């Protein structure tokens, strides 16, 4: 009830697999191995063989990788792709909900512009997935999302199926600068810590009330309302 992955569910559909042979590549295997002038056979979306002069049928699509590198897909674990798209203009710069130091109720995926041209640029550099987060203006900036680097019309069709939510928190200069400059808390690191403590204490209380209600009998539940839904507390209770 407090961190529902089914909300805004992924509609990702894998690309149709091809039979591919990549020839004469320089390869980093991601485990310390390096291979040169080497072939890679891919079938049903999986690497089935690596070696020199591999035999293959004429069903395979041939990619000449002479002078090029083949590596595992790079996963960008801290990205603002799509929430700060290019070109960087105010109308689409939606990575920080800098209206309160704690905005745990917002989700980065609701700001992502899927037409950000940086996706294609990143793909040319081998980046195949992103963990996209809100910015660091706030103590608690909201939920992050994991997406595949695909050309799609909606963010739901890019979302990595069953990937857990994450939570962006910023502990240093940015929150105290953003809010201190406005004459608000936090303006110091001790203000940062106090803001965190207050939020997590509130979340503990919210979670306790939820659990107490769920433990009641069906008869008792008919006599009282469930705790009032709070989107901010839902996220924090989900972390707890």
Regions found by a protein language model. Give the residues of each.
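Structured core elements
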Residues: 21, 41, 76, 131, ...
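Solvent-exposed loop/turn segments at secondary-structure junctions
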Residues: 27, 48, 69-70, 79-82, ...
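Soluble non-cytosolic domains of exported or imported proteins
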Residues: 16, 36, 57, 96-100, ...
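Polyanionic/metal-chelating signatures
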Residues: 118, 123-240
